[in-house]
């Protein structure tokens, strides 16, 4: 018993060190393959006994696709708060596309080890060996580590749960729902798809791969994916009635605003990778659900005004060396912010919060101050030239913040839908292009990769 406790203490300390290194430098350099294997061994032991359907009690923050975009992941956690004070549910697709799939996954695993009751991880379609062989994770692992570690990561992915319920009122998964779900027993009776082929048939393939059918209400083969099905509004309505739930939350698709409500607000798609693949102008969102099941969206807005191709190698090198970590004890902050990324990548200023109906918003005013130009310096203690150059690229970006008393609960939404089921909520207001940006610490960002769906 003492040996086990001592071993756990050592692993926990290793996880803390890895998290600190990842958040400060965006890398795992300095840690051996054996260190990573120790984390993988521990997380596998934690995940193995978990069922396919995990039960969660609100409050919780729900994350969509991450896709190796480490900086955006850290910025989200910096804004919404961190465990043990806050609970997380991740809907999958941690790897591929972005450059930091390794660091994102290790960060998530370490957080799960340290806060096993507060961090919940689901499996996405990119946590399938065949998929992450083709879309970047294997290549990244071969470049940073070795193929053996890539195989072990996929063994751990096979132990991830498939779906989650929040207070038995909200059902969450990566892909979508299935007409094969007849009751809660259909979900609790699933077996984890530990063999690759098990991910490609039955109920599980739909939970990982399916998409909404926005053209008509029929169930069709998902031609775009080449696998699984498309489900319509009637399937959503029937499932909500059958399971007595109010909302379904899924990920799997890039959304321009970072999220979308569909089918009388019973289906929410959330996508947490802003400026996806570096070529899109999409926002990224997470959903926060309070203890009373009040729903709020937190969104990151990408910045088009900064391109790594405009920086010379000397400036990039100094910028990387001067990278600073996020706050160790972040607090929720909905004020105007601006995040300077390392490596000259696209910037993601924090857009703010608003309720699902975005009833009222307030905007910051445009900052007309002209920054003072300072000479280039390679001194690690002075990064003025880089920051000045970035400030010159700014044109002013909107920061939208909700009024907190405008957030609606799921119960009030249900009552409203019961009165006027044909009424749809007004779309969120377009953020002002003339808002100012306040300075905040830099964070890592992902480079261009692909514009395909998650």
From Swiss-Prot:
Family: Belongs to the PPP phosphatase family. PP-1 subfamily.
Transmembrane segments: none
Cofactor note: Binds 2 manganese ions per subunit.
Enzyme nomenclature, EC number: 3.1.3.16
Active site: 126 (proton donor)
Residue ranges with Pro residues bias: 424-447
Reaction(s) catalysed by this chain's protein: O-phospho-L-seryl-[protein] + H2O = L-seryl-[protein] + phosphate; O-phospho-L-threonyl-[protein] + H2O = L-threonyl-[protein] + phosphate
Keyword Hydrolase: yes
Cofactor(s) named in the record: Mn(2+)
Name of the molecule in the record: Putative serine/threonine-protein phosphatase C27B7.6
Domain of life of the native organism: Eukaryota
Enzyme class: hydrolase
Sorted UniProt keywords: Hydrolase, Manganese, Metal-binding, Protein phosphatase
GO molecular function, one term: protein serine/threonine phosphatase activity
GO CC annotation terms, alphabetical: cytoplasm; nucleus
InterPro entries to which the protein is assigned, alphabetical: Calcineurin-like_PHP_ApaH, Metallo-depent_PP-like, PP1_catalytic_subunit, Ser/Thr-sp_prot-phosphatase
Region of interest (Disordered), ranges: 414-454
Residue numbers binding Mn(2+) 1: 65, 67, 93
Binding site for Mn(2+) 2: 93, 125, 174, 252
């Amino acid at each position: 018993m003492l040996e086990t406790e001592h071993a756990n203490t050592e692993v926990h300390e290793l996880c803390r060190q890895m998290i600190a290194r990842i958040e400060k430098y965006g890398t795992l350099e300095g840690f051996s393959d054996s260190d990573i294997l120790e984390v993988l061994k521990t997380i596998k032991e934690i995940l193995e006994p978990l069922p396919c359907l995990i039960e969660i009690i609100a409050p919780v923050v729900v994350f969509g696709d991450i896709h190796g975009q480490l900086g955006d992941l850290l910025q989200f956690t910096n804004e919404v708060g961190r465990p043990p004070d806050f609970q997380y549910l991740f809907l999958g697709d941690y790897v591929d596309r972005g450059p930091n799939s390794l660091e994102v996954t290790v960060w998530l695993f370490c957080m799960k080890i340290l806060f096993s009751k507060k961090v919940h991880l689901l499996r996405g379609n990119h946590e399938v060996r065949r998929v992450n062989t083709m879309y970047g994770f294997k290549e990244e692992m071969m470049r940073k580590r070795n193929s053996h570690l890539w195989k072990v990561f996929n063994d751990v992915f096979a132990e991830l749960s498939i779906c989650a319920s929040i207070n038995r009122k909200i059902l969450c998964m990566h892909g979508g729902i299935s007409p094969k779900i007849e009751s809660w027993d259909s979900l609790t009776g699933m077996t984890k798809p530990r063999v690759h082929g098990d991910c490609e048939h039955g109920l599980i393939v739909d939970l990982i791969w399916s998409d909404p059918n926005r053209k008509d209400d029929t169930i069709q083969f998902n031609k775009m994916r080449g696998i699984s099905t498309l489900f319509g509004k009637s399937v959503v309505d029937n499932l909500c009635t059958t399971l007595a739930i109010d909302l379904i939350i899924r990920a799997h698709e890039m959304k321009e605003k970072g999220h979308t409500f569909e089918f009388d607000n019973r289906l929410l798609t959330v996508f947490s990778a802003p400026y996806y693949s570096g070529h899109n102008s999409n926002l990224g969102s997470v959903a926060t659900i309070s203890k009373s099941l009040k729903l709020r969206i937190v969104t990151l807005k990408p910045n088009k005004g900064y391109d790594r191709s405009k920086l010379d190698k000397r400036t990039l090198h100094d910028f990387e060396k001067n990278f600073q970590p996020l706050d160790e004890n972040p607090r929720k902050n909905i004020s105007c912010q601006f995040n300077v990324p390392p490596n000259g990548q696209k910037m993601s200023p924090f857009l703010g919060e608003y309720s699902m109906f975005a009833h009222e918003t307030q905007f910051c005013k445009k900052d007309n101050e002209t920054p003072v130009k300072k000479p280039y310096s390679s001194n690690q203690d002075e990064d003025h030239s880089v920051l000045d150059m970035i400030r010159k690229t700014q044109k002013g970006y909107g920061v939208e913040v909700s009024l907190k008393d405008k957030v609606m609960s799921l119960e009030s939404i249900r009552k409203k839908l019961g009165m006027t089921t044909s009424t749809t909520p007004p779309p969120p207001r377009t953020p002002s292009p003339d808002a100012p940006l306040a300075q905040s610490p830099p964070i890592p960002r992902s480079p261009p990769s692909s514009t395909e769906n998650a």
